[in-house]
Amino acid sequence: MNPEYDYLFKLLLIGDSGVGKSCLLLRFADDTYTESYISTIGVDFKIRTIELDGKTIKLQIWDTAGQERFRTVTSSYYRGAHGIIVVYDVTDQESYANVKQWLQEIDRYASENVNKLLVGNKSDLTTKKVVDNTTAKEFADSLGVPFLETSAKNATNVEQAFMTMAAEIKKRMGPGAASGGERPNLKIDSTPVKSASGGCC
């Protein structure tokens, strides 16, 4: 068993371009935020280790490009993901409407029992909000998927989103699931593709 951690979970952030995926990752992994927006090119990732129920869990979080032209690059990262976080922008109705399309991508490329989490980001922009919390919650409930509204800018629910995902995966793995080093299905077999760092908006 690897002494550094008990579990290694690979998470994937997906959603339309500009919804704040990179911002959520920066806030969770580095506790930083930037107003500038630089589009993620292809795929980027960060690692953060957390403690959950007395276990050390290493989270490898992959941030994907939302643009159509990168879909072929990013689709390969669905395989082997333990959890996928679908992000939309609460001030952008189209990004919410496209959640269904992203869920289809998960069905097409990810493993059958992958954990999912729906996140409505930019909750701090209350006056510009167009996607109703209740509507999104009901949609998530109909899929049996946890739902949270977050703000990468003021750190609202960001920690909770990733911790919820880690807890759901750990629950699915069950007490018999071994460490990242022992079980092949917990090993990360993707070759890291380092990209230009994604900015935020």
UniProtKB/Swiss-Prot annotation:
Motif Switch 2 location, chain numbering: 65-80
**Enzyme class, spelled out:** hydrolase
Q: Where is this region: Switch 2 region?
A: 64-83
Q: Where is this region: Disordered?
A: 173-201
Q: What are the UniProt keywords, alphabetically?
A: Acetylation, Autophagy, Cytoplasm, GTP-binding, Hydrolase, Lipoprotein, Magnesium, Membrane, Metal-binding, Methylation, Nucleotide-binding, Phosphoprotein, Prenylation, Protein transport, Transport
Q: What is the effect of changing residue 21 to M?
A: Abolishes GTP-binding
- Place the motif Switch 1 on the sequence: 30-45
EC number assigned by the record: 3.6.5.2
Reported modifications of this chain: Prenylated; by GGTase II, only after interaction of the substrate with Rab escort protein 1 (REP1).
At which positions is GTP bound? 17-23, 33-36, 39-40, 66, 121-122, 124, 151-153
InterPro entries for the chain: P-loop_NTPase, Rab, Small_GTP-bd, Small_GTPase
Q: Which catalysed reactions does the entry list for this protein?
A: GTP + H2O = GDP + phosphate + H(+)
One cellular component GO annotation, for this chain's record? Answer: phagophore assembly site membrane
Q: Which cofactor does it need?
A: Mg(2+)
Binding-site positions, Mg(2+): 22, 40, 63
Regulation of its activity: Regulated by guanine nucleotide exchange factors (GEFs) which promote the exchange of bound GDP for free GTP. Regulated by GTPase activating proteins (GAPs) including TBC1D20 which increases the GTP hydrolysis activity. Inhibited by GDP dissociation inhibitors (GDIs).
Source domain of life: Eukaryota
Annotated membrane topology: Lipid-anchor
The GO terms describing molecular function are:
G protein activity; GTP binding; GTPase activity
Q: One of this protein's GO BP terms?
A: endoplasmic reticulum to Golgi vesicle-mediated transport
Q: Which NCBIfam families match?
A: small_GTP (TIGR00231)
Functional description taken from the UniProt entry: The small GTPases Rab are key regulators of intracellular membrane trafficking, from the formation of transport vesicles to their fusion with membranes. Rabs cycle between an inactive GDP-bound form and an active GTP-bound form that is able to recruit to membranes different set of downstream effectors directly responsible for vesicle formation, movement, tethering and fusion. Plays a role in the initial events of the autophagic vacuole development which take place at specialized regions of the endoplasmic reticulum.
Oligomeric and partner information = Interacts with MICAL1 and MICAL2. Interacts (in GTP-bound form) with MICALCL, MICAL1 and MILCAL3. Interacts with GDI1; the interaction requires the GDP-bound state. Interacts with CHM/REP1; the interaction requires the GDP-bound form and is necessary for prenylation by GGTase II. Interacts with RabGAP TBC1D20. Interacts (in GDP-bound form) with lipid phosphatase MTMR6 (via GRAM domain); the interaction regulates MTMR6 recruitment to the endoplasmic reticulum-Golgi intermediate compartment. Interacts (in GDP-bound form) with lipid phosphatase MTMR7.
One further remark on this entry is: Rab-1B binds GTP and GDP and possesses intrinsic GTPase activity.
The free-text domain note is: Switch 1, switch 2 and the interswitch regions are characteristic of Rab GTPases and mediate the interactions with Rab downstream effectors. The switch regions undergo conformational changes upon nucleotide binding which drives interaction with specific sets of effector proteins, with most effectors only binding to GTP-bound Rab.
Report the protein name in the record. Ras-related protein Rab-1B
Q: Which organism does this sequence originate in?
A: Rattus norvegicus (Rat)
